[in-house]
């Protein structure tokens, strides 16, 4: 299936000069959505990724991470923006183009030595994925890979990620 044909391009969003890759058109297509999850799971099996948990980055990582965890027989753990989780958290601050941001995960969600796959809809510069990886490693977990639906290759996000398998289904 041609996933690119299910992803809508929106020029000048959210600001002039940006070409936004809109996945809502992929999500509404029942065959495309099923294929996306099945294909991502297949790539994880092919890479022999033995995982305990899929971590989904807020918020579109939740959309793909939860069904992927189900397909892989793993648990799902959300990584959220600061202040969104009700219990005690591990947190990490990271640099953005114009400031900083913070990611959090519940303290009781991950245990040291857990094997983790990080999933999101898209990798651009790699900042959020890299911060999530550092958070996982701070806790003492083993990062076994990343899974992305879309990779914007020109932004070279993967060069900021640890040396583990990186799966991307569609490249621009």
Curated annotation (Swiss-Prot):
Gene name linked to the record: apt
The species this protein was found in: Trichormus variabilis (strain ATCC 29413 / PCC 7937)
Catalytic reaction equation(s): AMP + diphosphate = 5-phospho-alpha-D-ribose 1-diphosphate + adenine
GO CC term (a single one): cytoplasm
Protein's name according to its UniProt entry: Adenine phosphoribosyltransferase
Top-level taxonomy: Bacteria, Bacillati, Cyanobacteriota, Cyanophyceae, Nostocales
Entry-linked InterPro entries: Ade_phspho_trans, PRibTrfase_dom, PRTase-like, UPRTase/APRTase
One of the GO biological process terms: AMP salvage
Documented EC number(s): 2.4.2.7
Compartments reported by the entry: Cytoplasm
């Amino acid at each position: 299936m041609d996933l690119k044909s299910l992803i809508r391009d929106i020029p000048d969003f959210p600001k002039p000069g940006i070409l936004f890759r809109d996945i809502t058109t992929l999500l509404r297509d029942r065959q495309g959505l099923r294929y996306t999850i099945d294909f991502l799971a297949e790539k994880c099996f092919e890479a022999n990724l033995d995982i305990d948990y899929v971590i989904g980055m807020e918020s579109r990582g939740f959309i793909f991470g939860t069904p992927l965890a189900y397909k892989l027989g793993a648990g799902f753990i959300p990584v959220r923006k600061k202040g969104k989780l009700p219990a005690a958290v591990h947190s990490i601050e990271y640099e953005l183009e114009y400031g900083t941001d913070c990611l959090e995960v519940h303290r009781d969600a991950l245990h040291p030595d857990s094997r983790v796959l990080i999933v999101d809809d898209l990798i651009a510069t790699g900042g959020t994925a890299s911060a999530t990886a550092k958070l996982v490693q701070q806790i003492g977990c083993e990062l076994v890979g990343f899974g992305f639906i879309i990779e914007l290759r020109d932004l070279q996000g993967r060069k900021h990620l640890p040396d583990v398998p990186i799966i991307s289904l569609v490249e621009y």
